């Protein structure tokens, strides 16, 4: 009897293995509430200190403006650095069709996938320079004000891009037009973000603002600051909560900010955090036929960050976007900027979480899975294959992302796992066609040590990645590596001949794979801080099925009977408690997945006659048994 010790990884059993519980109960059980509360207290102290410094500055400089408009751009003092005010600013200077979100809707609303995913029962937090106009008719009573402050056009436009109904004018329909929205101002955003997941079950938030570059020290360009670290700590602790940040509009400034880098190295602060989705802006795309269909806006800020990470992450339409405004309950207006692209992306995040929850007993995917899914399925953009510092991983494609979730276990793999220290996770996939094989890993990384963030150094290149995971694919003697970019030459094309040591998302693409079995391996560099690292694995292709491996138990730990079976299959074990199971057909496709009942009996009456495999799960372990259905 041969036993194989599993010390490499823990398999997160997808929510389809769990009893159906409410989202709130799930969050209460699976999120570290004590750590979140500690962060809230920390951020509140920082906010109080910052406000005291601002009050002191304006008592000495009463003629200065604390909050004002410059054209259509709202600016407000956020902090005092070396005696000078630093300002936040809004980034405003046919979204659903550009990113194919409309394909997820009901057929009566233009959907083509038969899903009816429109944001029903989903909630989004929108932080902005003011609040949205609650009473706008296109909000239909679905917007709630949390902070009592000024109603603003920008906040109303952003909120509308996410969830406006468009009942009177279809051009105003938001991406997730049946979702609920919470409107808050940006002054204490970090503190409020620590409570939004637990108090309001908000899985996605939008932040269409950032540091105003006018007058800001040049070292801020591309800098990973303490505010970015705070956001990363928050997302790491929250696990299921994913903020979307606008990349910024600094590329068309006159005079230009950071002119030495020719439009690159502009994204900074919270917008440069590792664990968020940073969104750039492009023109409308009516029919994507290839990379040249995606045209960059004149203003969208480009990466890299100072440590060379890929930013923006993705792009969406941000030019000439019509949406709701605050001047009246029926008013609308056209704005442009990464402020308008970001809420389109956030809306897609809501739709994909909704689709996943519909498939998985109302339980959400990890933030890392959602981010990885969006980046994995983005349409190619830019002058060369792979990512770049202008478009990131490309144009969001909600349809493609939804199809990956729908086909999990059939032509795609989506897994949430834990890599243990000094371990390697390995799986194999059977490829049945010559269309591209794509594998990605995504993880929510820990915040770096506080003394490593940038406090005034131009182009500080210290790596901010804490736990560095690496993915590679092998077939025989062939080895395939993920895409990487060279921050020293930001305009150069991406390469795929070495490991990526900067980003917490990695992607391998094999354009013309030979048919056969490929091995996907994930390992890590150095010692994993915390002893392990959760990560998400996404694999897609035209005909990709994960090979079943019997790797966890002794062969005699379980017995399956009768075999062949008619309507009921029984499993008996005297040594291990079975928690859940999956049934696969001979092509490796999942045809059933459920939790175990108290009798360890499985109803197989609906299965067609043939050969099947049942994968049994217990804690960290799994095993596969073959059976025949009469």
PLM regions with names:
Residues 394-467, 537-546:
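Secreted peptidase-domain scaffold signal
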Residues 32-37, 44-126, 146-151, 227, ...:
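N-terminal domain-start motif of subtilase-like serine proteases
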Residues 21-25, 165-169, 182-275, 306-309, ...:
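Substrate-binding/access-modulating region of protease and related hydrolase catalytic domains
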Residues 540-561, 567, 574:
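Residue-level detector of functionally pivotal "anchor" positions at catalytic/ligand-binding pockets or at interdomain
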Residues 18, 609-630:
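C-terminal tail/sorting-segment detector
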Residues 19-21, 95-192, 199-204, 214, ...:
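Subtilisin-like serine protease catalytic core
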Residues 315-384:
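Hydrolase catalytic cores
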Residues 127-139, 282-343:
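Catalytic-core environment of secreted peptidases
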């Amino acid at each position: 009897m041969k036993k194989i010790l599993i010390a490499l990884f823990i398999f997160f059993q997808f929510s389809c293995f769990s009893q159906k519980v409410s989202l709130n109960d799930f969050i209460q059980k699976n999120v570290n509430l004590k750590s979140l509360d500690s962060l809230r207290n920390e951020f509140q102290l920082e906010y109080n200190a910052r406000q005291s410094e601002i009050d002191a500055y304006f008592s000495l400089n009463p003629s200065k403006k604390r909050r004002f408009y410059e054209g259509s751009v709202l600016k407000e003092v956020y902090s005092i650095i070396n005696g000078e005010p630093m300002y936040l600013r809004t980034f405003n200077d046919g979204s659903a069709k550009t990113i194919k979100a409309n394909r997820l809707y009901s057929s009566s609303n233009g959907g083509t996938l038969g899903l009816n995913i429109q944001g029903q029962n989903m909630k989004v937090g929108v932080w902005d320079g003011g609040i949205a106009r609650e009473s706008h008719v296109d909000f239909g009573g679905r917007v709630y004000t949390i902070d009592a402050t000024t109603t603003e056009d920008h906040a109303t436009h952003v909120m509308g891009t996410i969830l406006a109904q468009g009942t009177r004018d279809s051009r105003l329909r938001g991406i997730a037009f049946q979702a609920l929205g919470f409107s808050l101002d940006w002054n204490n955003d970090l503190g409020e973000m620590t409570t939004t997941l637990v108090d309001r079950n908000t899985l996605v938030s939008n932040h269409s603002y950032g540091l105003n570059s006018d007058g800001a020290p040049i070292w801020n360009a591309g800098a990973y600051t303490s505010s970015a670290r705070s956001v990363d700590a928050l997302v790491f602790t929250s696990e299921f909560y994913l903020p979307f940040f606008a990349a910024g509009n600094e590329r068309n400034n006159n005079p230009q900010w950071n002119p030495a880098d020719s439009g690159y190295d502009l994204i900074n602060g919270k917008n440069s955090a590792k664990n968020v989705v940073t969104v750039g802006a492009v023109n409308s795309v009516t029919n994507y036929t290839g990379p040249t269909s995606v045209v960059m806006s004149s203003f969208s800020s480009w990466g890299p960050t100072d440590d060379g990470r890929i930013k923006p992450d993705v792009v969406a339409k941000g030019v000439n976007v019509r949406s709701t405004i605050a001047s009246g309950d029926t008013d609308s207006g056209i704005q442009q900027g990464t402020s308008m692209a970001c809420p389109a992306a956030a809306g897609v995040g809501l739709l994909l979480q909704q689709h996943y929850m519909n498939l998985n007993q109302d339980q959400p995917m990890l933030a890392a899975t959602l981010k990885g899914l969006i980046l994995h399925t983005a349409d190619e953009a830019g002058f060369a294959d792979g990512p770049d510092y202008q478009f990131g991983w490309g144009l969001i494609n909600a349809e493609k992302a939804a199809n990956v979730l729908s086909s999990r276990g059939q032509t795609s793999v989506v897994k949430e796992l834990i890599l243990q220290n000094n371990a390697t996770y390995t799986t194999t996939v059977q490829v049945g066609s010559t269309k591209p094989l794509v594998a990605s890993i995504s993880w929510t990384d820990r915040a770096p040590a506080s003394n490593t963030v940038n406090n005034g150094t131009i182009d500080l290149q210290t790596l901010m990645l804490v736990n560095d995971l690496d993915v590679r694919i092998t077939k025989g003697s062939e080895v395939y590596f993920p895409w990487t970019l060279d921050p020293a030459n930001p305009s150069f094309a991406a390469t795929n001949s070495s490991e990526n040591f900067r980003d917490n998302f990695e992607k391998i693409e094999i354009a013309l794979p030979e048919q056969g079995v490929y091995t996907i391996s994930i390992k890590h560099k150095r010692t994993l801080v915390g002893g392990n690292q959760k990560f998400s694995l996404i694999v897609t292709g035209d005909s990709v099925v994960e090979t079943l491996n019997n790797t966890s138990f002794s062969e005699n730990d379980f017995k399956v009977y009768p075999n062949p079976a008619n309507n009921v299959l029984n499993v008996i074990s005297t040594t291990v408690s079975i928690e859940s199971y999956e049934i696969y057909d001979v092509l490796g496709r999942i045809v059933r997945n459920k939790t175990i009942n108290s009798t360890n009996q499985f109803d197989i009456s609906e299965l067609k006659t043939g050969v099947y495999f049942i994968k049994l799960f217990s804690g960290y372990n799994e095993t596969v048994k073959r059976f025949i259905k009469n």
